[in-house]
């Protein structure tokens, strides 16, 4: 059966199955799978926190990450420096980064004290350090970055850092539906799948 976990990544864990330097990885706290493996959907850098999805369905993971499917990601970002109306406009219109144009689909100020203010941003791709690089292109520094949503899945308030929750069937079907993967068929009397979706 298709399974999806949502994991609340803490700071300091790397998004890799093994680290030559011996740093903790996001895979270490996941439940073991028999005759299967967890595939990570997208990544977060070592200093970022928040929602990471894992699935045992490699095709689903691939489609959720592929830029052509434009799956929206949402982040809460704490920024050091003044984000002027002009900068907000630049970030929504698009900025040339070293790997091409990038932009936020939405950016909303969420308050804060002094030079540290929180913003909520949305974008439909997940290039390496893209959120940080967009702000850095405007001379601003990101001091905290938390992913709060990936597609139809939001980070639940009750989920603590370093913990995971398994999505229920309805949540899985909703997320899979965003990338045109049909629900898997029901199971027979002995829990054996009696048909797979053709994708």
Where are these regions (language model features)?
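Basic, flexible Lys/Arg- and Gly-enriched helix-loop patches that mediate nucleic-acid binding at interfaces
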Residues: 1-196
